[in-house]
Amino acid sequence: MSKEMKGQYEPVAEIGVGAYGTVYKARDLQSGKFVALKNVRVQTNENGLPLSTVREVTLLKRLEHFDHPNIVKLMDVCASARTDRETKVTLVFEHVDQDLKTYLSKVPPPGLPLETIKDLMKQFLSGLEFLHLNCIVHRDLKPENILVTSGGQVKLADFGLARIYSCQMALTPVVVTLWYRAPEVLLQSTYATPVDVWSAGCIFAEMFKRKPLFCGNSEADQLCKIFDIIGLPSEEEWPVDVTLPRSAFSPRTQQPVDKFVPEIDAMGADLLLAMLTFSPQKRISASDALLHPFFADDPQACSKQEHFTHICTATDEVK
């Protein structure tokens, strides 16, 4: 942490160590509020920070001005040299005590009420639509990157960090999960905002199942598990700019949604299939997903607090 940041923030607890660095819960000494500090190490060369990292930090500084109820607020970005070969980028976010993974793990049987899932998904897609309208592809959506406040407010985190994270990966031998990655990413094809909608579809199914939908242990295995459910795409749909041919996979037919997500209702099943469409061009957008009949009944009709009173926050507040 830079001298300026040390004078402004007081770390009080380590709350996570992952592929992309260490996250601390800290107190803002000026406001007294808690924040989340994320330290990311970036490899440098003889010319200093890679240009891609400089561009990404510039993007992050622009994101400081974002103000959306379903986006985690980025409050500050600071880069400071640690050695000739390494620079530490410190990101300061608003602090939220639990993520969706923790939240779902606390849900008692038989699972979340349908209205709660509608509420969570509507907020999730609203945040995602906002990112996409601002030309930001998240690339790494998963339950750990979706935060849920004790009052049930959903906030997307870790957006706009893809290039910085790719630099960090050279320094950290941690395997990043493949379970929420879109087929075009697994096939190393070109991709854009539809990759996030695929990930959102996987998370949508997980809200019903309370466990991941596709649990592959390699890119090929992940694709096999996907095709076991959605069926093997046609030759016409298979991307041309990939090294893995369609013939590498055995023929499969699409499974009924109620077979792999038996808890889902008819409208939810229709939306899920639209989100888990193989072709990115045919996959529903976040904006169109928000207009889907699944959300026709207002999820705010019931008291939001009633939905969330049975689920406490992931960690106790540090006094």
From Swiss-Prot:
Q: Does the keyword Flavoprotein apply?
A: no
For the biological process aspect of GO, one term held by this record is: regulation of G2/M transition of mitotic cell cycle
Would you say which domain of life the source belongs to?
Eukaryota
Which UniProt key words apply to this protein? ATP-binding, Cell cycle, Cell division, Cytoplasm, Kinase, Nucleotide-binding, Phosphoprotein, Serine/threonine-protein kinase, Transferase
Binding partners and assembly: Forms a stable complex with D-type G1 cyclins.
Function as written in the Swiss-Prot or TrEMBL entry: Probably involved in the control of the cell cycle.
| PANTHER family, per the entry | CELL DIVISION PROTEIN KINASE (PTHR24056), CYCLIN-DEPENDENT KINASE 4 (PTHR24056:SF129)
Give the similarity note.
Answer: Belongs to the protein kinase superfamily. CMGC Ser/Thr protein kinase family. CDC2/CDKX subfamily.
* Protein name from the UniProt record: Cyclin-dependent kinase 4
Q: What is the lineage of its organism?
A: Eukaryota, Metazoa, Chordata, Craniata, Vertebrata
